[in-house]
Amino acid sequence: METITYVFIFACIIALFFFAIFFREPPRITKK
């Protein structure tokens, strides 16, 4: 059961990284 927890944590970290990159790379979407 520990493997599932580790995978979940890893997935969360990757998702956070992807979100950060997506929000940081294209600043044209949030152009005010």
UniProtKB/Swiss-Prot annotation:
Q: Which UniProt keywords apply?
A: Membrane, Photosynthesis, Photosystem II, Thylakoid, Transmembrane, Transmembrane helix
Its GO CC terms? Answer: photosystem II reaction center; plasma membrane-derived thylakoid membrane
Q: Where is this protein localized, as stated in its record?
A: Cellular thylakoid membrane
Q: Where are the transmembrane segments?
A: 8-23
Q: Where is the signal peptide?
A: none
Q: Domain of life here? A: Bacteria
Cofactor-binding details, from the entry: PSII binds multiple chlorophylls, carotenoids and specific lipids.
Sequence ranges on the Lumenal membrane side: 1-7
The record, for Pfam families, names: PsbT
Q: Mind telling me which SUPFAM superfamilies this protein's record contains? A: Photosystem II reaction center protein T, PsbT
Q: Which residue stretches are annotated as topological domain Cytoplasmic?
A: 24-32
Which parts of the sequence carry Blocked amino end (Met)? 1
Q: Which InterPro entries match?
A: PSII_PsbT, PSII_PsbT_sf
- What is the recorded membrane topology of this protein? Single-pass membrane protein
Any one GO biological process = photosynthesis
The answer to whether UniProt assigns keyword Repeat to this entry is no
- Cite the record's note on assembly: PSII is composed of 1 copy each of membrane proteins PsbA, PsbB, PsbC, PsbD, PsbE, PsbF, PsbH, PsbI, PsbJ, PsbK, PsbL, PsbM, PsbT, PsbX, PsbY, PsbZ, Psb30/Ycf12, peripheral proteins PsbO, CyanoQ (PsbQ), PsbU, PsbV and a large number of cofactors. It forms dimeric complexes.
The job of this chain, per UniProt, is described as: Seems to play a role in the dimerization of photosystem II (PSII). PSII is a light-driven water plastoquinone oxidoreductase, using light energy to abstract electrons from H(2)O, generating a proton gradient subsequently used for ATP formation. Found at the monomer-monomer interface of the photosystem II (PS II) dimer, plays a role in assembly and dimerization of PSII. PSII is a light-driven water plastoquinone oxidoreductase, using light energy to abstract electrons from H(2)O, generating a proton gradient subsequently used for ATP formation.
Give the family this protein belongs to, as stated in its UniProt record: Belongs to the PsbT family.
Q: What is the designated name of this protein?
A: Photosystem II reaction center protein T
This chain's source organism reads Thermostichus vulcanus
